[in-house]
């Protein structure tokens, strides 16, 4: 990068500049999400040859279970008695849960109790359906969830149906099953029917995001795209600059020295000018990450050509 000059001791072909972006200071803070906005740079960068992510501070404020993820509801149908059945969609509050609290929350919704531990609605058949998890407080067990009847109505319950092909209104739709609450519970099939007791196929995983993508659209289609997906259903944006593994507990700040970032410099096929950036965070399904009105910051290292 450095060559001897005739007048100055050293002439350099490339100038490196660091651009700090903190979403707290974006102009459109009241009308845009921190995970999807466009910024007009105060300085125009001319003859840019590369861009690279060099620092990131990301608060872990996004939820594993939420309406925006489409996994905050559970459809159940129970057949009981000689010829009776009941079906209902149950809504789980948005939030982050550990496995045991996740199962407790669902059970409390199925069977609400009063301050004395008595059923509020003993006449409702769902009060006798329970999820359980084979996991102790110190982490021992299989981590798998089961569902079945309990209590005085156990013998009258004939069949339980779990249907993850239905939306929050109880209607069948075509959303991928991997985006439903069934996958968080470890139930990987679209539907479970014909029995009154089921064991999950996989372990419970209420934490929804294992990684996120940082996308930077510089409005130049003149660079390499280092991220390639080998699966048809995996969505990758052409402007992905980094893949960020999520580590640590929720509601903490994730710093670049505490995370695993996969990132390659964006190399342009020829010098470009940059004055506008669209910044987005995607979850692993390719959806805009819902940050719950919190902000993040990062640093871009931009290399530009210098006229000698």
Locate predicted features:
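The ATP-binding site of the protein kinase catalytic domain
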Residues: 1-308
């Amino acid at each position: 990068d450095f060559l001897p000059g005739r007048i100055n001791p050293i002439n350099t072909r490339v100038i490196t500049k660091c651009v700090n972006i903190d979403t707290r200071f974006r102009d459109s803070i009241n009308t845009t999400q921190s995970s999807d906005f466009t910024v007009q740079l105060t300085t125009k960068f001319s003859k840019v040859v590369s861009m690279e992510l060099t620092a990131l501070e990301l608060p872990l404020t996004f939820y594993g279970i939420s309406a925006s993820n489409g996994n905050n509801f559970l459809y159940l149908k129970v057949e009981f008695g000689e010829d009776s059945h009941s079906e209902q969609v149950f809504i789980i509050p948005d939030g982050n849960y550990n496995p045991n609290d996740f199962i407790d929350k669902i059970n409390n919704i199925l069977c609400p109790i009063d301050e004395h531990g008595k059923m509020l609605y003993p006449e409702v058949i769902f009060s006798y359906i329970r999820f359980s998890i084979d996991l102790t407080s110190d982490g021992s067990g299989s981590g798998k969830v089961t569902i079945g009847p309990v209590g005085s109505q156990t013998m009258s319950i004939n069949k339980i149906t779990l249907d993850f092909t239905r939306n929050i209104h109880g209607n069948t739709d075509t959303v991928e099953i991997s985006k439903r609450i069934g996958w968080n519970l470890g139930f990987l099939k679209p539907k479970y029917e014909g029995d009154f007791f089921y064991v999950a196929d996989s372990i419970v995983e209420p934490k929804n995001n294992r990684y996120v993508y940082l996308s930077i659209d510089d409005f130049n289609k003149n660079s390499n795209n280092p991220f390639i997906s080998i699966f048809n259903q995996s969505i990758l944006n052409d402007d992905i600059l980094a893949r960020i593994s999520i580590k640590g507990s929720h509601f903490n700040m994730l710093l670049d020295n505490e995370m695993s970032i996969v990132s390659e410099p964006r190399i342009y096929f020829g010098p470009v000018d940059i004055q506008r950036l669209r910044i987005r965070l995607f979850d692993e399904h390719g959806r805009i990450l819902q940050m719950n009105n919190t902000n993040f910051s990062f640093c871009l290292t931009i290399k530009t050509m210098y006229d000698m």
